[in-house]
Amino acid sequence: MADPQATNGTGAACAERDASDVGDVSDVGDARDEGAGRVVAVRGAVVDVAFDGGALPALNEALTIPVDGAAPILAEVHAHLSDAAVRALALGPTGGLRRGAAVRATGGPIRVPVGDAVLGRLLSVTGAPGDDGAALAADVERRPIHRGAPPLAEQKSANALFATGIKVIDLLAPLAQGGKAAMFGGAGVGKTVLVMELIHAMVERYRGISVFAGIGERSREGHEMLLDMRGSGVLGRTVLVYGQMNEPPGARWRVPLTALAIAEYFRDERAQNVLLLMDNVFRFVQAGAEVSGLLGRLPSRVGYQPTLASEVAALQERIASVEGAAVTAIEAVYVPADDFTDPAVTAIAAHVDSMVVLSRAMAAEGMYPAIDPVASSSILLDPLVVGEAHVEVAIEVRRVIEHYRELQDVIALLGIDELGADDRRLVGRARRLQRFLTQPFAVTEAFTGQAGASVEIADTIAGCRAILRGDCDDWRESSLYMVGTLDDARRKEAAAREADARREAAAAASGAGPGTTSDPASGSAEPQGARHGR
């Protein structure tokens, strides 16, 4: 597929050429002689270059600009200004760059290292190592970051479930192996933790390759993720590609393409399943808006670039599966000001198979993962894909929780006792379902002290069906909170009842009468803010 810049005449997908590799910007010795130029203007990250030879570099071709006392600057051509000049976007800081500096065209787009050599490594947008490991070998295989999607005849549709072991996702918003899923949420609701748990699930369940693209996020978060992956043992089958928020917009804008090039290699050349994770796709759109402004284009709605739809489509359409190997994409999407009608959010949502919506209200109640069971959805929730039993339970769970939300205003004003018997019963089951759909994560075990739980889809369906049937109506709500299967909750309930019995026996023996215990229907250990009427 063509690069999104092709839609407005300022860029196009550059054809893959048999030219020198461009990943480590210091490796430019075989740049073509006729590609020599000079800098004629520098405006922040925008660099105008004149070429006296008359042969201009193609759009999206990489340029290298030596800088005295520093590493060469890598730039990418985005516009032809005249028959002898181009406008390029620097992918690194332009400090120290001056007019008249020599420029070399490399003869092709940016090329990044791929293969086993990059597993367990942290790379920049150009493929340069950013960790404390050894330098990559000079003969490592490289691929261009600009490529088209596989032909339609070679693409394979996503119709198999990607079981995550996360109850609320597998039940209500199942992911497709070889499909695209997006996790939408505002700041601080748990998107990154959810992405890390899915990396853990992929390594444990599928033994595949994970490629993580950190787009415009905090350097601290990137460092923490690197350390966490080392500690959990998943780094050896993962590639990290970072373009952090302190980097120029061009670097942040191209990071997803670098990650895609690596994922495509393992899909095409090794026939391996790949889990592609991107955090955060909104920052990709944001970087594109910055680039658009730097190149002088008029903004569109809410200040976004006029090419928003085509840029998002060009990225998403490259995420495709072929016969024998699947690329499963899971994307975290920041929702600015919790506004789900934002143009960037709606543009991304149009391309995904599963929408996992994280709720600030559920996070405030301590319901983690804070996934909204009503707003989340998936095209795979179909009897022909997941089966009749799965769909029936999912629909009923969603109906019960939605009806409970409709009753919350009445409960807040009049109290739960003013509801009819059927509504009180439904409220109790809805609250138990909400707590049963919480779950401890393996990646948070070091902080919570609670072992992570991965639950099979059949166990999730069986547990929800039992709650809907009323089998747990006399259980404490706290017994269902942060457990794996219903058997785990049953053991927790039995232990709580046994503890209550011991306390009552001790109180009776001391002559103080029966002890005051928590309401067995609600429990006393539920999360803060999870009482009736919130």
Curated annotation (Swiss-Prot):
GO terms for molecular function: ATP binding; ATP hydrolysis activity; proton-transporting ATP synthase activity, rotational mechanism. Signal peptide: none annotated. It is found in: Cell inner membrane. InterPro entries: AAA+_ATPase (IPR003593), ATP-synt_VA_C (IPR055190), ATP_synth_F1_bsu (IPR005722), ATPase_a/bsu_AS (IPR020003), ATPase_alpha/beta_chains (IPR050053), ATPase_F1/V1/A1_a/bsu_N (IPR004100), ATPase_F1/V1/A1_a/bsu_N_sf (IPR036121), ATPase_F1/V1/A1_a/bsu_nucl-bd (IPR000194). SMART domains: AAA. Its EC number is 7.1.2.2. It is a peripheral membrane protein. SUPFAM superfamilies: C-terminal domain of alpha and beta subunits of F1 ATP synthase, N-terminal domain of alpha and beta subunits of F1 ATP synthase, P-loop containing nucleoside triphosphate hydrolases. It is an enzyme of class 7 (translocase). Coiled coil: none annotated. PROSITE patterns: ATPASE_ALPHA_BETA. Keywords: ATP synthesis, ATP-binding, Cell inner membrane, Cell membrane, CF(1), Hydrogen ion transport, Ion transport, Membrane, Nucleotide-binding, Translocase, Transport. GO terms for cellular component: plasma membrane; proton-transporting ATP synthase complex. It catalyses: ATP + H2O + 4 H(+)(in) = ADP + phosphate + 5 H(+)(out). Residues 1-10 have a biased composition (Polar residues). ATP binds at residues 185-192. Residues 1-30, 494-534 are annotated as: Disordered. Residues 494-505 have a biased composition (Basic and acidic residues). It comes from the Bacteria. Belongs to the ATPase alpha/beta chains family. Produces ATP from ADP in the presence of a proton gradient across the membrane. The catalytic sites are hosted primarily by the beta subunits. F-type ATPases have 2 components, CF(1) - the catalytic core - and CF(0) - the membrane proton channel. CF(1) has five subunits: alpha(3), beta(3), gamma(1), delta(1), epsilon(1). CF(0) has three main subunits: a(1), b(2) and c(9-12). The alpha and beta chains form an alternating ring which encloses part of the gamma chain. CF(1) is attached to CF(0) by a central stalk formed by the gamma and epsilon chains, while a peripheral stalk is formed by the delta and b chains. This is ATP synthase subunit beta 2. It comes from Burkholderia pseudomallei (strain 668).
